[in-house]
């Protein structure tokens, strides 16, 4: 049997692509080396932020707004909502370049973002402490996503729509010819007109020339009471420290508040180098500088987890066909800020398989930018 689309890597983007391509009427085969959702990638740990006014650049805003529409639609397929509209407050020095980007994208796209000075910030959320020169940009329409629930939902919906799924079966080789794409797996060879490579952190095992660096990252849950929960209208947050370190976190659930540091981490070259949480001496204390200064009422570390970022050189996404192979789309280099975009990236992959022109300007995400 020849498929219209083979998906290599069915974590976040691949799971979404499998659903949207199958829903569009294509014959799709989803593959993965593991059984998604899983702990080996970048999507575990229960939750991920979604922000619309985007500090990483205005080029992402059209994508994330479309993603939000798709998240809202996906949430209707579950009793438990996938998207929680908690609001997100971005904290940092008034002269922060990141916050300037947030404000600029909000203005350009007419997004609902409220600017709070330090006094107003601490009045609204007395649990938060910031220096006098800090501001908060609060986006009430943003929030967080239940990442593993999302992937489980996409997989179920794709399967129910007739998508073939081959999991726990690593792809060892990809071959291109005039008839399309062939993959080799432990279960045999499979053929398709087109392929999506969304293999995440270890994409270079299949495409060694891609400029992607795996980075080991950690996040942890700390003791927190009801003041820090959505029931008390406590928001999700990002926070920039005076030294430039960036943190992110979520409202407490079940008296546990999750927080992580976005920058830093350990560069790794193989899956076995991604040691579990607490294997690196600094893991448990990584969030202390932020908690001690900004959220001093939070208690001790309860537990943590390790994940991996697939970092591109400029930490912007890679969305492009493989050089010399126009029938193979690669989506990688999501650099620790990609999960919120998973549905729109999956939709882009489905449109690619259908032969449709992308609805978005993907020029900033082409591979050619690294050779200029």
UniProtKB/Swiss-Prot annotation:
Cite the SUPFAM superfamilies for this sequence: FAD-linked reductases, C-terminal domain, FAD/NAD(P)-binding domain
Cofactor(s) the record lists: FAD
Give the note describing cofactor binding and stoichiometry.
Answer: Binds 1 FAD per subunit.
Asked if Oxidoreductase is a keyword of the record, the answer is yes
Uppermost EC category: oxidoreductase
Keywords carried by this UniProt record? FAD, Flavoprotein, Oxidoreductase
Positions where S-8alpha-FAD cysteine occurs in the chain: 307
Indicate which residues the UniProt annotation says bind FAD: 4-34
Record's catalysed reaction(s):
N(alpha)-methyl-L-tryptophan + O2 + H2O = L-tryptophan + formaldehyde + H2O2
The EC number(s) attached to this protein equal: 1.5.3.-
As one GO molecular function, the record gives:
flavin adenine dinucleotide binding
One Gene Ontology cellular component term attached to this UniProt record is: cytosol
Pfam families according to UniProt: DAO
Superkingdom field: Bacteria
Q: Which family does it belong to?
A: Belongs to the MSOX/MTOX family. MTOX subfamily.
The entry's function note states: Catalyzes the oxidative demethylation of N-methyl-L-tryptophan.
**Self-association or partners: how does it assemble?**
Monomer.
| Protein name in the entry | N-methyl-L-tryptophan oxidase
